[in-house]
Amino acid sequence: MESAAYILVLALALGVIFFAIAFRDPPRIGK
């Protein structure tokens, strides 16, 4: 179960970084 918790935290961190970059720079993907 430790691996599951580690993956969850890692995914959350990646999500935060992704949104931070998305809001900092204009969206270049799509549209």
UniProtKB/Swiss-Prot annotation:
Source taxon at top rank: Bacteria
UniProt-listed GO biological process terms: photosynthesis
Primary location: membrane
Membrane-spanning ranges: 3-23
InterPro entries: PSII_PsbT (IPR001743), PSII_PsbT_sf (IPR037268)
Pfam family, one: PsbT
UniProt keyword annotation of Transmembrane helix present: yes
SUPFAM superfamilies: Photosystem II reaction center protein T, PsbT (SSF161029)
PANTHER family: PHOTOSYSTEM II REACTION CENTER PROTEIN T, PTHR36411
Subunit structure: PSII is composed of 1 copy each of membrane proteins PsbA, PsbB, PsbC, PsbD, PsbE, PsbF, PsbH, PsbI, PsbJ, PsbK, PsbL, PsbM, PsbT, PsbX, PsbY, PsbZ, Psb30/Ycf12, peripheral proteins PsbO, CyanoQ (PsbQ), PsbU, PsbV and a large number of cofactors. It forms dimeric complexes.
Similarity comment: family membership: Belongs to the PsbT family.
Protein's name according to its UniProt entry: Photosystem II reaction center protein T
